[in-house]
């Protein structure tokens, strides 16, 4: 395992997971504020997210400390479960109980609770668990190498983000050619990781995976700029403040893509 800028790979992984927690909490706040926090369960991602953030930062500062590692594993597991429960809530209240139910499935997927969004909390929780265990010196978890598990989590997360992007960009009628980028690049990056895991000694597989993960990382910042531009194009633009944020493309979503790309690069090169 190698380091970068004085930090080991697992420390970087934990800090990136903490950043992911911040971004997903911001995104969740916008969505739940839009719906008026009509359910108490809508506060759950913030409780779980804050605990995850604090434990991830703490164990990244002092890796290997038993108490901090235990706390990080506990909060990571809590976040993983909270994300799964949240996905169930989004499914129940966003599809099942809506008029038309599954007969209006596409309508509900486009205009109600985003079905895959809660899984971002599960992804962050999983990465914190893996980062904490790896930072304490463990090579495996549940019988599998931690590096493989990290790359597996990143792969699944990239596919989920591609699916969610496809839904939301379809809702936006793909009015900009750049809206196709995450729908194309993220699955390619996920596929390249699978290729690398299937043929770890293949230089081409590793190089292509690295290139596509860099494209994912940099593309996330480009997407964030375009989402801000989308906010400014609303009536009244950014001067509308909260109204612009609520009704415009989610500003933090592309940054989650960048964080996942960085997490994949950390696993590829530093673990």
Q: Each predicted region: which residue ranges?
A:
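Hydrophobic cores of alpha-helical transmembrane segments in multi-pass inner/ER membrane proteins
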Residues: 47-58, 114-132, 184-195, 250-268
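C-terminal TM-helix exit segments that contain a strictly Trp-centered aromatic cap at the helix terminus
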Residues: 78-96, 215-233
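Juxtamembrane "helix-exit" motif on the non-cytosolic side of transmembrane helices
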Residues: 26-34, 60-63, 91-98, 163-172, ...
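Non-cytosolic membrane-interface motifs at loop->transmembrane helix junctions
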Residues: 36-45, 68-72, 100-111, 173-182, ...
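Membrane-interface helix-loop-helix junctions at boundaries between adjacent transmembrane segments
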Residues: 67-82, 89-146
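Transmembrane alpha-helix entry/boundary detector in multi-pass membrane proteins
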Residues: 6-11, 30-49, 146-149, 169-185
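Short aromatic-rich membrane-water interface segments that cap or initiate transmembrane helices
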Residues: 3-11, 103-118, 144, 240-255
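Cytosolic juxtamembrane helix and N-cap/initiation of the first transmembrane helix
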Residues: 1-17, 135-154
């Amino acid at each position: 395992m190698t380091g970068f800028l004085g930090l080991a790979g697992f420390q970087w992984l934990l800090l990136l997971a903490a950043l992911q927690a911040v971004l997903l909490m911001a995104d969740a706040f916008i969505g739940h504020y839009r719906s008026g926090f009509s359910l108490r369960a809508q506060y759950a991602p913030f409780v779980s997210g804050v605990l995850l953030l604090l434990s991830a930062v703490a164990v990244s500062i002092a890796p290997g400390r038993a108490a901090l590692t235990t706390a990080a594993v506990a909060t990571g597991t809590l976040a993983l479960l909270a994300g799964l429960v949240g996905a169930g809530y989004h499914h129940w209240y966003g599809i099942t109980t809506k008029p038309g139910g599954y007969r209006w499935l596409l309508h509900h997927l486009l205009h109600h609770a985003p079905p895959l969004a809660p899984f971002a909390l599960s992804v962050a929780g999983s990465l914190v668990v893996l980062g904490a265990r790896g930072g304490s010196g463990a090579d495996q978890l549940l019988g599998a190498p931690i590096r493989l598990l990290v790359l597996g989590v990143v792969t699944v997360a990239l596919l989920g983000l591609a699916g969610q992007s496809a839904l939301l960009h379809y809702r936006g009628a793909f009015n900009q050619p750049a809206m196709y980028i995450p729908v194309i690049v993220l699955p390619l990056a996920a596929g390249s990781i699978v290729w690398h895991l299937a043929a770890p000694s293949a230089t081409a597989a590793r190089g292509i995976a690295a290139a596509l993960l860099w494209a994912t990382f940099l593309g996330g910042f480009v997407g964030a700029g375009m989402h801000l531009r989308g906010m400014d194009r609303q009536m009244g633009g950014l001067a509308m403040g909260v109204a612009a944020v609520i009704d415009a493309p989610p500003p933090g979503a592309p940054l989650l893509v960048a964080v996942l790309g960085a997490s994949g690069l950390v696993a590829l090169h530093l673990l």
